Amino acid sequence: MEALEQRIRQDGRILPGHIIKVDGFLNHQVDTKFLGELADEFAKIFDITGVTKILTAEASGIPLAAVCSYKYGIPMVFAKKAKSDNIEGGLYMSEIFSYTYKKTVTLICSKDWITADDKVLVIDDFLANGEAMRGLLDIVKLSGAELVGIGCAIEKGFQHGGDKLREAGYPLHSLAIIDQADENGFVFRKQ
């Protein structure tokens, strides 16, 4: 998506450790109008007819998934990274290694909110090595729900998480794939 690539070039920064910082519009300060454009793009890519849930991970995926949820009129569920006292009943759990936080976390989702009757569209802000996405896909599989698609705003192509998911046959589409990010700037994959 050309508009997203331009926004990354304009407002994105590259930090040590291949961290791509786009917190001025995507996942800290949020440009909801622009996220609406991303949601519109996902609606062109995926057949959202019949989708019953949008699933994402706490916390940075929430803004984009919430905008998609609002625009499509579909409930959003986010997998939590810590069990709180207000979660009751059965849980789906998947242990992942967080690239950003450099530690193992457990994604948790109440069995009340995703069931075998659901058709799930997974939406997230970033895809790097694929660990968080693997955890979300585990939750979909554990629930018995049908996976409709996986939409990511930005994929770090150089970390190959997306390539592995595509090779495994998952219906993944990223709006911008960055194949290189260094002192020379960003190099985007042609799609």
Language model segments and positions:
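Active-site-facing substrate-recognition patch
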Residues: 1-51
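PRPP-dependent phosphoribosyltransferase catalytic core
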Residues: 2, 7, 18, 137-191
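Short glycine-rich phosphate-binding loop at a beta-alpha junction
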Residues: 51-58
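Conserved acidic residues
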Residues: 52, 118, 148
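Short Gly/Thr/Asp-enriched flexible loops that form oxyanion-binding sites at enzyme active sites
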Residues: 63-72
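Short, glycine/charge-rich flexible loops or terminal/linker lids adjacent to PRPP-binding catalytic cores
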Residues: 74-120, 186-189
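Active-site/ligand-binding-proximal alpha/beta "capping" segment
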Residues: 116, 124-142
